[in-house]
């Protein structure tokens, strides 16, 4: 085969229906070396030159071949890439700067957690209001916007999207573990308490938050009072929909202990996409805890041992707690739901369907985000 026949097929991972692009390797660059002498970094430069509109910078792409993410310092020969092979291009985005969670006032947070924990167990309307808000995507997005550090904490995001886990973590006994390990989750839970308190009557009278006007809840970050929900879901407390006064100073829950800007910062598209992709849980569990069943549910949960012992919450422990929900969703139905994306991942050489299904479910079927999750640990 002559040097002029050396070519590769290039396909963008996020455009599965687009035709492949043929990349012919320049003969003058080869010299006495074969195609296999090219480095992956040089191949990226060639691809960026070929696909200038789609790939403006070679530093913003990863290359995938036979299910492996290619390292810049290796050669085509190292990965066994032959003429006519198809290389998949995974486009990256610039990483957003990490945000530090706001400090937590543990005394104030303990008081808020006690109010929330009591309300969840004694008021069915309050419990329903909390879980309706958390299962609504717009409301969850607003919580992410209003809570610095939440988008980069996958465990916290997962807890907010699972009813049983939320009930376990909203226990005041969890604070000693949550404050150092997941402060953003503590702040988010407090925001949930205040947001729902503005639209649904609290069952207990011993709460510092009850005396706050609804306008204060609405003005605070996270105090969105079901604005993302439909009108039929907003009937818990009609009077709470009064228009806030523009002159009313905004306030925040005391547990946040932060004197910065009260309004939510603008959230970037990549930050929100990453946050949602990392929330590797179903949208909600099929069972809403009730006062009669909650104790049994939390008692049998894999998280219950950590509640009693106060041990740190690890990713492995969190994954075990979510396994029941993943199994309940049914593997056959998942395979049917994500069949096109599964096939695309197989075409890239990723043959572990179970791994692919977990990544697809965590990202809502976003093939780009699923690939980033799969390769988060680096090339095998």
From Swiss-Prot:
Annotated function: Interferon-stimulated protein that positively regulates RNA virus-triggered innate immune signaling. Mechanistically, promotes 'Lys-27'-linked polyubiquitination of MAVS through TRIM21 leading to enhanced the IFN signaling pathway.
Record protein name field: Ubiquitin-like protein 7
Gene Ontology MF, one: polyubiquitin modification-dependent protein binding
GO cellular component: cytosol
Presence of keyword Transcription regulation: no
Keywords for this protein: Immunity, Innate immunity, Phosphoprotein, Ubl conjugation pathway
InterPro entries: UBA (IPR015940), UBA-like_sf (IPR009060), Ubiquilin (IPR015496), Ubiquitin-like_dom (IPR000626), Ubiquitin-like_domsf (IPR029071), UBL7_UBA (IPR047878), UBL7_Ubl (IPR047877)
Post-translational modification: Deubiquitinated by OTUD4 which stabilizes UBL7 expression.
Low complexity bias spans: 239-255, 270-312
Subunit architecture: Binds ubiquitin. Interacts with MAVS; this interaction enhances TRIM21-dependent 'Lys-27'-linked polyubiquitination of MAVS.
């Amino acid at each position: 085969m002559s040097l002029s026949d050396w070519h590769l097929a290039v396909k963008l991972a996020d455009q599965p229906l687009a035709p492949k692009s043929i990349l012919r390797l320049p003969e003058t660059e080869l010299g006495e070396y074969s195609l296999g002498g090219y480095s992956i970094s040089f191949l990226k430069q060639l691809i960026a030159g070929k696909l200038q509109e789609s790939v403006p910078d070679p530093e913003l792409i990863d290359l995938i071949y036979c299910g492996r993410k290619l390292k810049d310092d290796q050669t085509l020969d190292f990965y066994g890439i032959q003429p006519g092979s198809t290389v998949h291009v995974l486009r990256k985005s610039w990483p957003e700067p990490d945000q530090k969670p706001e400090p937590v006032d543990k005394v104030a947070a303990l008081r808020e957690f006690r109010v929330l924990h009591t309300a969840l167990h004694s008021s069915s309307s309050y419990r329903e209001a909390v879980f309706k808000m958390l299962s609504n995507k717009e409301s969850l997005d607003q919580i992410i916007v209003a809570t610095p550090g939440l988008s980069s904490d996958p465990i916290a995001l997962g807890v907010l999207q699972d009813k049983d886990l939320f009930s376990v973590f909203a226990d005041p006994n969890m604070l000693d573990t949550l404050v150092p390990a997941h402060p953003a989750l503590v702040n988010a839970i407090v925001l949930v308490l205040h947001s729902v308190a503005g639209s649904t009557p609290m069952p207990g009278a011993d709460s510092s938050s009850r005396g706050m006007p609804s306008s204060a809840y609405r003005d605070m970050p996270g105090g969105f009072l079901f604005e993302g929900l439909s009108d039929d879901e907003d009937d818990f407390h009609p009077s709470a929909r009064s228009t806030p006064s523009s002159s009313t100073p905004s306030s925040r829950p005391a547990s946040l202990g932060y004197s910065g800007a009260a309004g939510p910062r603008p959230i970037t598209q990549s930050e929100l996409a990453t946050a949602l992709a990392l929330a590797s849980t179903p949208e909600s569990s099929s069972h809403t805890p009730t006062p009669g069943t909650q104790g049994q549910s939390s008692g049998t949960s894999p998280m219950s041992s950590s509640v009693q012992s106060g041990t740190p919450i690890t990713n492995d422990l969190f994954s075990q707690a979510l396994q029941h929900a993943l199994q309940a969703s049914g593997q056959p139905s998942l395979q049917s739901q994500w069949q096109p994306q599964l096939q695309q991942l197989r075409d890239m050489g990723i043959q572990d369907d179970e791994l692919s299904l977990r990544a697809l479910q965590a990202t809502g079927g976003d093939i780009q985000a699923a690939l980033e999750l799969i390769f988060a640990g680096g090339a095998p």
